[in-house]
Curated annotation (Swiss-Prot):
GO cellular component assignments: chloroplast membrane; endoplasmic reticulum; endoplasmic reticulum membrane; Golgi apparatus; Golgi membrane; Golgi stack; membrane
Keywords: Chloroplast, Endoplasmic reticulum, Golgi apparatus, Membrane, Plastid, Stress response, Transmembrane, Transmembrane helix, Transport
Tissue: Specifically expressed in seeds (at protein level).
Region (Disordered): 1-40
Name of the encoding gene: TSPO
Disrupted gene: phenotype observed: No visible phenotype under normal growth conditions.
Compositional bias segments (type: Basic and acidic residues): 1-16, 23-35
UniProt-recorded name of the protein: Translocator protein homolog
Remaining remarks: Plants overexpressing TSPO show increased sensitivity to ABA and salt stress. Cultured cells overexpressing TSPO have reduced greening and chlorophyll a content under light-growing conditions.
Function: Stress-induced membrane protein that can bind heme and may play a role in the transport of tetrapyrrole intermediates during salt stress and contribute to the detoxification of highly reactive porphyrins in the cytoplasm.
């Protein structure tokens, strides 16, 4: 009879342990579902902010290019040299550069970099505004020298962005590198346009 009591008590403990484990697993599954829902909601917010961060600079650049557009003088000056790209390629690459800078700025923002280093935000805004001003000054007004001055300021702000972004997020810093290369090429185009 003692052995029956032991088995019975063991079975009762086993049932209680099984019930407790099942309850723990259920709570864990509920917690995981809640965490999964939280992560999904956070990912949706992140995707929305990424879309805005990339699309806004591209759309503003497109707007400035279209409405503040260019005059016919670029075509005449560009024909004087074979290495100067056509205007549509110049504008398309400026749009891509704006998108890359928007993505880099978003990566810095996600890491809280604009709070840690507010100068990074000021440099980003300065390079973006100077990029917007460059097209009308160089092409609409037709001043190659003033355009070169604006572009050199934009390039300096871009280099400052590279240094600041690279300290916060190396990936963001690497995204600025193609923009720096493009800025150097456009500076060379500006010199040619200023001389021509």
């Amino acid at each position: 009879m003692d052995s029956q009591d032991i088995r019975y008590r063991g079975g009762d403990d086993r049932d209680a342990a099984t019930t407790a484990m099942a309850e723990t697993e259920r709570k864990s599954a509920d917690d995981n579902k809640g965490k999964r829902d939280q992560k999904r909601a956070m990912a949706k917010r992140g995707l929305k902010s990424l879309t805005v961060a990339v699309a806004a600079p591209v759309l503003v650049t497109l707007f400035a290019t279209y409405f503040l557009g260019t005059s016919d003088g670029y075509g005449n000056r560009a024909k004087s040299s074979s290495w100067i790209p056509p205007l549509w390629l110049l504008h398309t690459t400026c749009l891509a550069s704006s998108g890359l800078m928007g993505l880099a700025a978003w990566l810095v923002w996600v890491d809280g970099g604009f709070h840690k280093k507010p100068n990074a935000l000021y440099l980003y805004l300065a390079q973006f505004l100077l990029c917007l001003v460059w097209d009308p000054v160089t092409f609409r007004v037709g001043s190659g020298v003033a355009g070169l001055a604006v572009w050199l300021g934009q390039s300096a702000a871009l280099f400052g962005c590279y240094k600041a972004f690279n300290e916060i997020s190396p990936v963001a810093g690497n995204l600025v590198k193609p923009c720096l290369a493009w800025a150097a090429f456009v500076a060379a185009v500006n010199v040619k346009l200023a001389v021509a």
